[in-house]
Amino acid sequence: MAGALKKTMIYLGLADGDEYDEQPRAAEREAAPRHEVVEARRPAEPDTDPHMEAVRPAAVRDPEPAERPEPVTPSGSTAAEPVEPRRPARPEPVDPGYRAPVTPIKRAAASSAEGASVHTLSTVHPRSYNDAKAIGESFRSGVPVIMNVTDLGENEAKRLVDFAAGLVFGLHGSISRITSKVFLLTPATVDVVGAEQGESSVADSPFDGD
């Protein structure tokens, strides 16, 4: 680009052509010493020593493979022989008439209260009307009561019989006369076998029928 501009200026007469010719020459002069310096910096090749040429490295041999030791068999022992697999034992034929022994297990007999006869009776010998509480508690618990009023006077015996009649009426039971002064009070849930049933009435005297 700069060279074309200078040529144009020389062509127009604005620049001197000698200066243009001297500039490439000066550039060549500056480049020449540089080339010499570069050549001077090259190291001199060393002289070859004839003894060095004679010496050659010995060839490196590959290491020989190590020998594998043979397996040593201990003295007095023989090589193991292949073991044949054992065959499963055949099941012995079973006698069709054989039966395994059975041990019977004893079971406790189940006790059931349903349908069982009543073996418990409560016998009361009242000495006063205050013993009516014991009669009422036994009858209310479902136990038949035999009431013997022979040790009471007529008035107290009548009061106690009236109390028993009201008791069995309120609890839907029954009262029956065994003797003139002995009465059986039966709850509604109990059936006494062998006793004659009679109607209970507070108006009846315990001494009727004597």
UniProtKB/Swiss-Prot annotation:
Main localization category: cytoplasm
Secretion signal span: none
Disordered: annotated span: 13-101
Its biological purpose: Cell division protein that is part of the divisome complex and is recruited early to the Z-ring. Probably stimulates Z-ring formation, perhaps through the cross-linking of FtsZ protofilaments. Its function overlaps with FtsA.
Protein's recorded name: Cell division protein SepF
Subunit and interaction comment: Homodimer. Interacts with FtsZ.
Gene Ontology BP terms: division septum assembly; FtsZ-dependent cytokinesis
Superkingdom: Bacteria
Keywords: Cell cycle, Cell division, Cytoplasm, Septation
Species lineage: Bacteria, Bacillati, Actinomycetota, Actinomycetes, Micrococcales
Start-end of Basic and acidic residues biased regions: 22-70, 83-93
GO cellular component, one term: cytoplasm
Similarity section: Belongs to the SepF family.
Subcellular location, record wording: Cytoplasm
